[in-house]
């Protein structure tokens, strides 16, 4: 594993021993990276490279536009996803891929919560990612359903994975508890438009 710092972001690169393996870009917390990688290895996943980006400003880097605080003690989401995506595409990916054993077979983008929202949003901004995974994606985010239903992805992904935990809809916060209905609606809309 090699670690870099690019624009205050920590980039951990886990190369595959096999040249030309796929590369997965995972936006995550720094304390989760090693356990994610170890669990994937324990599952016996096919050869792949993992590039984990952490030290993110979650409410800025992972959100597509401004949204006010969702609770009294929360901070607003400030809509820096486009700037972060540019950093990912123009600086992080070239530096990370220069350290890999050959060009990737394909690229995937994955994330949990707001990073899951970002993974889906990024598909509407760039055609670089062939696959994406949105784990417990923040599909409660104001305006995201309207955006998904009124825009087209830059390319049809080979695979798009959604997951949703069993506790997301049990919150008393009316903003957050719509994730239970919005995640399947996103899936159904994308499937109807032959995106999946």
What is the meaning of each model-derived region?
Residues 20-99:
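Serine-hydrolase catalytic machinery in alpha/beta-hydrolase-like enzymes
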Residues 189-196:
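Single conserved hydrophobic/aromatic residue that forms the stacking wall/gate
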Residues 1-22, 48:
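A domain-start/cap signature at the N-terminus of enzymes
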Residues 116-125:
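Short glycine-enriched nucleophile-adjacent loop
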Residues 111-115:
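Gly/Ala-rich beta-loop-alpha elbow adjacent to hydrolase catalytic centers
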Residues 117-118, 142-152:
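Alpha-helical scaffolding within the catalytic cores
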Residues 158-165:
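Catalytic His-Asp charge-relay segment
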Residues 133-140, 167:
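Active-site nucleophile loop of the alpha/beta-hydrolase fold
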């Amino acid at each position: 594993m090699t670690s870099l710092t690019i624009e205050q972001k920590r980039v951990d690169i886990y190369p595959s021993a096999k040249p030309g393996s796929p590369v997965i870009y995972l936006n995550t917390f720094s304390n989760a990276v090693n356990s994610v990688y170890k669990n994937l290895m324990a599952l016996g996943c096919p050869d792949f490279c993992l590039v984990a980006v952490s030290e993110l400003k979650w409410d800025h880097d992972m959100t597509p536009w401004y949204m006010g605080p969702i609770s009294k003690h929360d901070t607003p989401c400030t809509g820096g996803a486009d700037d972060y995506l540019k950093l990912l595409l123009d600086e992080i990916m070239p530096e990370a891929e220069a350290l890999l054993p050959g060009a990737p077979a394909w690229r995937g983008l994955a994330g949990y919560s707001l990073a899951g929202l970002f993974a889906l949003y990024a598909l509407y901004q760039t055609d670089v990612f062939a696959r994406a995974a949105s784990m417990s994606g923040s599909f409660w985010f104001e305006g995201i359903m309207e955006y998904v239903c009124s825009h087209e992805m830059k390319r049809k992904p080979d695979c798009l994975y959604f997951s949703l935990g069993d506790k997301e809809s049990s919150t008393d916060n009316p903003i957050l508890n719509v994730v239970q209905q919005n995640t399947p609606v996103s899936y159904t809309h994308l499937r109807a438009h032959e995106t999946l």
